[in-house]
């Protein structure tokens, strides 16, 4: 794959053999962004788990204190009073059978979904569409609930879902390149703490095997997986 001149110039600032601290990686991500807009800062984590085994699945939710820098579009499966509650909370799309039908026809212009329990039989008809995209409502992530207003508000306020893929990789967005160092570090710390907290008891050996920071269309920045504590102190002292 041929890389752009801007990408190659950015990549030259990064030593792929070096492990950077999270603060160094945040600053490099901001410096090596190759887009003309505020790029997304993403973290890719290789976990020491076997996702093929049910007792080693890693998934969860976390509320980023500074959000992701993007207002996610939320689709809600609800009817009656709960539909009105969802709309009042800021849901972008609200529906029931009609929303299911739209999705069956190819509509996917949303970033997250929420559903009331009574709607799940209908949502099940599009599980093969939503599931692979990480968009299926799930009670474990608080997206199948009667408290629709809170669920929508949480997502709009910076709540994100994470789930390890078949290769043992997990991807999370921690903000934009126009965030301050402290905002990105705080988001990263909160997310990483939650990922560590939900480590499966069946997982053996090193859990955090590899961590890489990157920006939209930017080069990867290897981060020391052992630097998981005192990140805020590091940020304050730098």
Curated annotation (Swiss-Prot):
GO terms for molecular function: rRNA binding; structural constituent of ribosome; tRNA binding. Keywords: Repressor, Ribonucleoprotein, Ribosomal protein, RNA-binding, rRNA-binding, Translation regulation, tRNA-binding. It holds the Pfam family Ribosomal_L1. It comes from the Bacteria. GO terms for cellular component: large ribosomal subunit. InterPro entries: Ribosom_uL1_bac-type, Ribosomal_uL1, Ribosomal_uL1-like, Ribosomal_uL1/biogenesis, Ribosomal_uL1_3-a/b-sand, Ribosomal_uL1_CS. GO terms for biological process: regulation of translation; translation. The keyword Phosphoprotein does not apply. Transmembrane segments: none annotated. Belongs to the universal ribosomal protein uL1 family. Binds directly to 23S rRNA. The L1 stalk is quite mobile in the ribosome, and is involved in E site tRNA release. Protein L1 is also a translational repressor protein, it controls the translation of the L11 operon by binding to its mRNA. Part of the 50S ribosomal subunit. This is Large ribosomal subunit protein uL1. It comes from Frankia casuarinae (strain DSM 45818 / CECT 9043 / HFP020203 / CcI3). The lineage of its organism: Bacteria, Bacillati, Actinomycetota, Actinomycetes, Frankiales.
């Amino acid at each position: 794959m041929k890389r752009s001149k801007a990408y190659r110039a950015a990549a030259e600032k990064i030593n792929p053999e070096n492990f950077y601290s999270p603060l160094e990686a945040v600053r490099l991500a901001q410096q090596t962004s190759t887009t003309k807009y505020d790029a997304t800062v993403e973290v890719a984590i290789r976990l020491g788990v076997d996702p093929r085994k049910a007792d080693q699945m890693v998934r969860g939710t976390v509320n980023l204190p500074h959000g992701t820098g993007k207002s996610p579009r939320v689709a809600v499966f609800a009817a009656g009073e709960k539909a009105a509650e969802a709309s009042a909370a800021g849901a972008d799309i609200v529906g029931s059978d009609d929303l299911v039908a739209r999705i069956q026809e190819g509509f996917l212009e949303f970033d997250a979904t929420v559903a009331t329990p009574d709607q799940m039989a209908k949502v099940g008809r599009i599980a093969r569409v939503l599931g692979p995209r990480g968009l299926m409502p799930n009670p474990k992530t608080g997206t199948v609930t009667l408290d629709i207003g809170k669920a929508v508000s949480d997502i709009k306020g910076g709540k994100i879902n994470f789930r390890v893929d078949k290769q043992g990789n997990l991807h999370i967005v921690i903000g934009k390149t126009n965030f301050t160092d402290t905002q990105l570090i705080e988001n990263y710390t909160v997310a990483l703490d939650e990922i560590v907290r939900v480590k499966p008891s069946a997982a053996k050996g090193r859990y955090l095997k590899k961590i890489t920071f990157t920006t939209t269309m930017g080069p990867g920045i290897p981060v020391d997986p052992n630097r998981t504590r005192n990140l805020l102190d590091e940020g304050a002292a730098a």
